[in-house]
């Protein structure tokens, strides 16, 4: 599924995600299919209110049209994320979250779960895909989706069949779990992943 809608994660999930994190910059997608008003979708303010109620410092926020457009998003975010920002939180479908995670120098988290709504599609401007599984794993995996990027859709780690960083099913494809581990290691988050 390339085009999805999204809902804010439950208050309990958000509180768990925010535990131990502060100095948050919030990025929200302005949505690519606003004419379809069949579901209520969250924006920056929905998440920001929850974070501030937990005493979290918001370093800033921005809404971006077509957040999944990496070139445009990179230009928009350049120089916009304030110094001192420790985490980026994205209010978007999985496509936007993956795009921001690829660009951000700090850990990126999603405040939403993506849902599949048949017939209500936006205009994804990326080769990335979102499974719209309604239980987003991107917070645990550094913004790399194990459902769509792993040929076996494994959610609890590598299968052990990868060779030289390539998938055993599709040798032209990088192993998603090796990429996940490398990103988490770069962000100093491997222990956090192992304790989930």
Where do the model's predicted regions map?
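Long, charge-rich boundary regions
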Residues: 163-196
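Iron-sulfur-associated redox domains of electron-transfer enzymes in respiratory
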Residues: 1-161, 170-171, 176
């Amino acid at each position: 599924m390339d085009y999805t809608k999204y809902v804010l994660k439950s208050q309990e999930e958000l509180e768990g995600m925010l535990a131990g994190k502060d100095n948050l910059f919030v990025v929200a997608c302005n949505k690519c299919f606003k004419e379809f008003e069949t579901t209520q979708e969250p924006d920056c303010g929905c998440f920001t209110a929850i974070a501030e109620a937990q005493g979290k410092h918001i370093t800033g926020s921005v809404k971006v049209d077509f957040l999944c457009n990496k070139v445009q998003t990179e230009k928009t975010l350049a120089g916009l994320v304030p110094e001192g920002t420790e985490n980026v939180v994205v209010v978007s479908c999985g496509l936007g979250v993956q795009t921001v995670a690829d660009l951000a120098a700090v850990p990126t988290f999603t405040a939403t779960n993506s849902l599949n709504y048949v017939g209500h599609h936006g205009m994804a401007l990326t080769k990335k895909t979102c499974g719209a599984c309604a239980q987003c794993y991107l917070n645990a995996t550094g913004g790399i989706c194990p459902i769509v990027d792993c040929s076996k859709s494994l959610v609890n780690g590598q299968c052990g069949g990868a060779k030289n960083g390539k998938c055993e099913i599709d040798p032209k494809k990088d192993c998603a779990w090796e990429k996940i581990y490398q990103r988490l290691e770069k962000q100093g988050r491997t222990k956090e992943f192992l304790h989930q």
